């Protein structure tokens, strides 16, 4: 079984990139096809550079540094890869990778991190949060995204079997592409996080500091609770704005090296998470340290946090809802959720589990495909 892995880009070490590396570990003879890639990123991920095949965008001006500027070319570029020599194509997709062209005798399995959020269900939120909901720039962006949405509709039908990274994304795949998906939660490497029972008197929030992560909402909540400390870790375009927003009880540290993040995560009273994520890796990392999570009760958080056992939920992305949840958490005692229970829950998202489930799914579907062809749901 000759395998090709398709990914939109390999330019940062993110969650989808780690998924690609894990799939490559399962199928070590596979080749990787991606629009653009950086060698240092592949080296950090442990992906051999000689296995990586890039598109013409790689050679365009600033192709690897400003690859998103070439979004209108992505559909055309992904279709130029010639994968005729492979039996199975596995696309790791949150944009156009699922649009790869395959033949009738090739099996295409898509590990879908999300339908394109800024083209579908988050379209209006994206425009608003990017300040592109009004004016000439707004119409230019809308005109650019319209053909991307049309392509994505077509690309969605090119997949033989979908894997979703969460049940929540599976529902969105059903809504967007009218297709069923099997959920296999992504691989979370918790080997670098150790269980810690020594909790201190502060809460932690950490993510990239962009609007949809709702870090500002968390800061506003703790501004209303001057007797409670909040530490915020992460870099991003909103860093200075969030520092100005924070009161004296809130420390916005900005980007920090891993050792600092891990130390703060291990000793935090609880981790506060307000984003509406497709899956969300960092709450699992927090729980792997034995730190419970106070999370927005929607989307992937309902799968990554075991409500009542490793944390609790709030129902609205508002400061008031977070205040209510934190007060409820504190009313439950000094350590309402056992660190060992948090760690045990996090271990259920291990890399070994992911690799086993991916291997079983691909091999099972390939055997069915060889015998009976495609049975589209």
Q: What feature does the model see in each segment?
A:
Residues 240-262:
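Nucleotide-activated donor-binding/catalytic signature segment of Leloir-type glycosyltransferases, i.e.
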Residues 129-162:
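Membrane-proximal helix-turn-helix segments that form the acceptor-binding/catalytic region
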Residues 194-213, 219-225, 231:
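Conserved donor-binding/catalytic core segment of Leloir-type glycosyltransferases
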Residues 317-320, 334-376:
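A charged, aromatic-enriched C-terminal amphipathic alpha-helix characteristic of glycosyltransferases
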Residues 26-98:
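Active-site donor-binding segments of glycosyltransferases and PAPS-dependent sulfotransferases
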Residues 292-296, 305:
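Short hydrophobic beta-strand element within catalytic cores of glycosyltransferases
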Residues 266-278, 291:
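Acidic donor-binding loop of glycosyltransferase active sites
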């Amino acid at each position: 079984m000759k395998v090709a892995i398709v990914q939109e880009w390999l330019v940062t070490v993110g969650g989808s990139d780690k998924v690609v590396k894990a799939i490559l570990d399962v199928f070590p003879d596979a080749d990787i096809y991606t629009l653009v890639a950086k060698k240092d990123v592949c080296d950090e991920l442990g992906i051999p550079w000689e296995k990586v095949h890039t598109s013409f965008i790689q050679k365009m001006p600033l192709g690897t540094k400003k690859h998103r500027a070439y979004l209108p070319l992505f559909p055309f570029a992904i279709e130029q890869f010639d994968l005729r020599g492979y039996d199975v194509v596995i696309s790791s997709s949150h944009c156009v990778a699922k649009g790869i062209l395959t033949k009738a005798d090739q099996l295409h399995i898509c590990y879908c991190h999300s339908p394109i959020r800024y083209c579908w269900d988050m379209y209006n939120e994206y425009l608003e949060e990017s300040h592109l909901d009004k004016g000439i720039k707004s119409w230019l962006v809308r005109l650019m995204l319209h053909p991307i949405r049309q392509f994505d509709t077509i690309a969605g039908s090119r997949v033989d079997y979908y894997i979703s990274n969460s049940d929540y994304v599976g529902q969105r795949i059903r809504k967007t592409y009218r297709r069923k998906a099997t959920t296999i939660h992504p691989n979370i490497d918790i080997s670098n996080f150790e269980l810690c029972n020594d909790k201190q008197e502060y809460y932690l929030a950490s993510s990239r500091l962009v609007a949809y992560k709702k870090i500002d909402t968390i800061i506003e909540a703790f501004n209303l609770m001057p007797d409670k400390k909040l530490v915020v870790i992460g870099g991003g375009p909103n860093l200075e704005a969030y520092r100005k927003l924070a009161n004296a009880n809130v420390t916005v540290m900005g980007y920090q090296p891993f050792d600092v993040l891990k130390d703060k995560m291990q000793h935090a009273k609880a981790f506060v998470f307000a984003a509406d994520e497709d899956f969300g890796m960092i709450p699992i990392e927090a729980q792997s340290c034995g730190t419970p999570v106070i999370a927005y009760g929607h989307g992937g958080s309902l799968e990554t946090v075991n409500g009542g056992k490793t944390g609790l939920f709030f129902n609205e992305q508002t400061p008031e809802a977070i205040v209510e949840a934190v007060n409820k958490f504190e009313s439950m005692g000094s350590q309402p959720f056992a660190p060992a229970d948090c760690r045990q829950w996090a271990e259920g998202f291990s890399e070994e589990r992911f690799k086993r489930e991916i291997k079983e799914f691909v091999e099972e579907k390939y055997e069915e495909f060889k015998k009976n062809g495609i049975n589209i749901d």
